[in-house]
């Protein structure tokens, strides 16, 4: 509430595992959310996360219904959730349930904590996943955790003009003009500062 009064934007980063009532109450104070959709497979959620997929999908639907700007991150782990058919199912669900303009961040896995035995995600695998999600109809698909990759750039879906160039977590160039492409005036969805 204090942030709202001070005109400060509130963003939630979450695994999406939250009950409906507290989520709806929280949404009134949020402007945006980024949810980690770990995989589009209940078996993965059960074996790797000790959870289930359905509550995460329901949380995503609720956030969209509540009017939040929503972005999704999928950490691609070699051999566990990098199956292209699963990526296509996930992207299709996102397009159908949340909208084609919902950004999807395909992120590189780095061996850490309990998964030190697995290799980092190859760049080629990330780019294949990105193409699969784009082919399923998502307009804004990015590759993350690979600074310098061209797939970090936001392109106008109408004319392909580079709107926002990033390097890792740094915005290097922002060509948006009042939330629109400067060439064709296409409105670019998002929460702009």
Task: Say what each PLM segment does.
Residues 1-121, 129:
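Conserved AdoMet/S-adenosylmethionine-binding subsite of the radical SAM
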Residues 79-193:
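Auxiliary Fe-S-binding modules of radical SAM enzymes
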């Amino acid at each position: 509430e204090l942030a709202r009064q001070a005109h400060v934007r509130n963003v939630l980063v979450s695994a999406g595992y939250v009950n409906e009532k507290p989520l709806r109450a929280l949404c009134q104070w949020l402007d945006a959310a980024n949810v980690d959709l770990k995989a589009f497979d209940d078996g993965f959620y059960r074996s790797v996360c000790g959870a289930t997929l359905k509550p995460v999908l329901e949380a995503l639907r609720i956030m969209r219904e509540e009017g939040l700007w929503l972005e999704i991150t999928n950490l691609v782990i070699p051999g566990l959730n990098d199956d292209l058919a699963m990526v296509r199912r996930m992207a299709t669900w996102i397009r159908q349930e949340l909208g084609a303009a919902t950004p999807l961040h395909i992120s590189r896995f780095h061996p850490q904590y309990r998964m030190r035995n697995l290799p980092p995600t190859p760049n080629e695998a990330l780019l294949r996943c990105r193409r699969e999600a784009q082919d399923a109809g998502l307009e804004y698909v990015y590759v993350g955790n690979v600074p310098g990759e061209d797939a970090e750039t936001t392109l106008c879906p109408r004319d392909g003009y580079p709107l926002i160039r990033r390097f890792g977590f740094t915005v290097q160039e922002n060509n948006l003009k009042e939330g629109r492409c400067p060439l064709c005036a296409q409105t670019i969805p998002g929460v702009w500062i």
